[in-house]
Amino acid sequence: EDDLEDFNPTIA
């Protein structure tokens, strides 16, 4: 989920 980190700085 690399894209998720782009939209979710919480999971990054």
UniProtKB/Swiss-Prot annotation:
<keyword id="KW-0964">Secreted</keyword>
<comment type="similarity">
    <text>Belongs to the SA81-like family.</text>
</comment>
<protein>
    <recommendedName>
        <fullName>Venom peptide Sa10</fullName>
    </recommendedName>
</protein>
<dbReference type="GO" id="GO:0005576">
    <property type="term" value="C:extracellular region"/>
</dbReference>
